[in-house]
Amino acid sequence: MVPAATPVATLLGVQITIQYFEGCPNWEVADERVRLALAHLGMGATDVTRELIDTPEKAVAAGFHGSPTILVNGRDPFADRGSPVGLSCRLFTTPHGLAGSPTVDQLMHAIESAGSRSSTGGA
């Protein structure tokens, strides 16, 4: 039997981390949108980990592509190949143009895709 306090996303194998640095306001928008996406997916009780990246060394060690970086099961579903690592604000391509955070729909898709990969054993 699964304990009642276990988040639904954890049961589905989905873990979410928002990496950020204090100088970028977009991580708070991303945090709100992640919560909305989880709520729309019926996963509103899911814990979201926040990880402060506050030095260039930590940015390199974490493979931090800018704030906010949203990791779903440890993977950045929005990373562009060759995007620089470092302490900077990040831009995302959305259906409405460039923005400081993915849309709720984009986040829902990323979370659902990660859950599907987890349940089928895919990477």
Predicted regions and their residues:
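Acidic pyrophosphate-coordinating catalytic loop
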Residues: 57-63
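Local sequence-structure signature of Cys/Sec-based thiol-disulfide redox active-site neighborhoods
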Residues: 7-39
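Iron-sulfur (Fe-S) cluster-binding modules
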Residues: 1-14, 28, 102-123
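Structural micro-motif
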Residues: 64-71, 87
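Thiol-based oxidoreductase modules, predominantly thioredoxin-like and allied folds used
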Residues: 44-56
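Functionally engaged cysteine thiol sites
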Residues: 3-5, 24, 86-91
